């Protein structure tokens, strides 16, 4: 029996992707003036259909890797301390993957297939620790992950001027599955999920983040994040990072002005 994903996204209503990768359309799917399937009579959604096909493959691969990864995360939390939160969202949905793949392909000037290969958080976890134990627990967990055979890359966003605070760890398991693990304090997690979340969602949708509005949104996130107390003991841990850069959207604007898009 086919595994089917039917989309509720406005651009994909009425489209079902089967296990074979075929796209099936319902008669309710909007068409343009020439009878092509599209969004409200607009452009043909070929790129988004291709993104949906790749998203399904990414999701199925992630689904196979997730049980073992989740067991490992529970073992690490039990062994080293820290609390796993947000486990209901450990698998990114097909619809979310579709949007991310399509958006990344467009803004980074890469193929849809390449954008899909670069997805690093189809399986993702968050561990929350007490500030006094945060650094020691993050270091212990990452070293334990290395000893278990994971490829580990640590990005330390606890930097002055960052619009986001936390430690993000990019993992690759023995099968090649990419996994993300974020380390937060209760304070930084609340900032990410509540205070800064609506601002970031607005910011990331901007075509040009250098506009006064974009700069204002980023300044709000930086100011909010500056209020968070930095846990001790993080010096030298991971690669220092300042916020989640969206500067490539400036390249998109330039490319459009030159007639490339």
Locate predicted features.
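Short linear motifs at secondary-structure transitions and domain/linker junctions
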Residues: 30, 92-105, 142-148, 157-159
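Charge-rich, low-complexity segments
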Residues: 43-119, 135, 139, 194, ...
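Generic structural motif
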Residues: 3-5, 84-87, 152-154
């Amino acid at each position: 029996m086919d595994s089917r994903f039917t989309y509720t996204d406005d651009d994909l209503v009425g489209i079902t992707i089967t296990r074979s990768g075929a796209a099936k359309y319902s008669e309710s799917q909007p068409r343009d003036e020439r009878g092509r399937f599209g969004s409200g009579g607009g452009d043909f959604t070929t790129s988004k259909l291709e993104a949906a096909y790749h998203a399904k493959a990414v999701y199925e691969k992630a689904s196979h890797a997730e049980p073992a990864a989740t067991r490992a995360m529970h073992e690490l939390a039990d062994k080293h301390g820290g609390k796993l939160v947000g486990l209901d969202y450990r698998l990114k949905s097909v619809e979310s993957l579709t949007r991310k793949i399509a958006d990344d392909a467009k803004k980074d000037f890469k193929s849809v297939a390449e954008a899909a290969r670069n997805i690093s958080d189809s399986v993702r976890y968050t561990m929350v620790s007490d500030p006094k134990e945060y650094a020691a627990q993050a270091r212990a967990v990452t070293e334990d992950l290395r000893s278990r055979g994971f490829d580990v890359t640590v990005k330390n966003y606890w930097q002055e001027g960052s619009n986001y605070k936390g430690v993000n760890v990019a993992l690759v398991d023995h099968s090649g599955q990419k996994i993300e693990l974020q380390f937060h304090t209760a304070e930084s997690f609340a900032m990410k999920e509540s205070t800064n979340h609506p601002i970031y969602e607005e910011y990331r949708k901007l075509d040009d983040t250098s506009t006064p509005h974009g700069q204002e949104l980023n300044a709000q996130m930086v100011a909010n994040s500056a209020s968070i107390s930095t846990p001790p003991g993080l010096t030298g841990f991971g690669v220092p990072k300042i916020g989640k850069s969206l500067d490539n959207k400036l390249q998109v604007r330039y490319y459009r002005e030159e007639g490339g898009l």
